[in-house]
Amino acid sequence: MKAVVSVLGEDQVGIIAKVSTLLAQKQINILDVSQTIMDGNLVMMMSVMIPENLDSYQLTNEFTELGKEIGVEINLRNAKIYDAMHNL
């Protein structure tokens, strides 16, 4: 499944590394990345390919927990749903 991972929060060392590490542990391929720092806040979007055998509900929970641990908001959305939300 193609999906979009968004990461928002105060910039700090290690955010990208920790998010990328979780993706690698789950064998999730990063297709594209865009990130910027705005007024000290990280705004990152990743297009990823999630293997079909992974449970997206469990994965969403893991990203939520990681976000809490590192002090950012991490959202995972199916790319089709993300596109529909932004093409109204």
What are the residue ranges of the model-derived segments?
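A conserved regulatory-domain signal marking ACT and ACT-like small-molecule sensing domains
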Residues: 1-88
